[in-house]
Amino acid sequence: MNDQPRMSKMRRYHAAVWDEPVIMEMGSKGRRGLVFREAEKKVADAVGPAELLIPQGMQREDPPNLPELSEQEVQRHYLHLSQETLGMMGISLFGTCTMKYNPRINEIIAARPEIAETHPLQDVQTLQGTLELIHNFDLILRELSGMDNFVFQAGGGAHAAYTHCCVTRAYHAERGELAQRNEIITSIQAHPCNPATAAAAGFDVITLPLEENGYPSTDALREAVSSRTAALLINNPDDMGIYNPEITDWVDIVHDAGGLCFYDHANFNGVMGKIRARELGFDACMYMLHKTFGAPKGGGGPAVGAYGCSKDLAPFLPCPV
């Protein structure tokens, strides 16, 4: 009998691979996942036809182009997709824009007590290492973006976009133009946090539609810009990965009208090292450090929205707390 210990043979990583069509190509006509019951007669008599509850201008003229599948088919479809979406520690579900791989060493460093267990009210002398990290990373982001200042208070991308909306308000208020400049322009394919934070900050939102090339036309922007324009909030590339090659013209148009330009770098992976926001003319930008960079994301740690701006906007940045 061989007393030598048995060595397990390492296998190459493998996961399920399905030849899965997109859901719009699946199903059969007339198939249903849920069949609604007919309304009781008393309810129907009291409420009337359901279509009368929808304003005429909002009623569809044609039936929606939706796939017709059973509940089991939908469940099986997304189960197959989930089995092909494996990360280092299991399924990776979280994220709306360009994702990337976080080396495990990054997760280990971020979980160290010197970082994860700091408190904003502890003795500043015990935070010098953390402050040095933040300062050095500030300089790195300035190099990548061309901006003059960065702050790291924002707890995520939407928070950083809201920071810019507040900076925009303060900038125009200082110039005596806040009452006039009440509109922020974005596109329908920009990250949803851009129109949402603009509205939360009290601005009216103008959303530009897409053309066949995948981004709004420059003429549409010209029509939207006016003396009421406070800022342009835009992703480039957008959330479909399409880069707008006319972006410098957009910046010039908004600047000529007295507005500010904000670059949402949610999809920075594709352009890092190729462009710099400030050199394109943008006044401010933000990075989600849980996307292009190594901060943990999802349940693994807090997000960070690094907000950078030109020296003209620096006086309106939030102060450290």
Annotate each language-model stretch with its function:
Residues 128-129, 159-321:
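Conserved PLP-enzyme active-site core in the AAT-like
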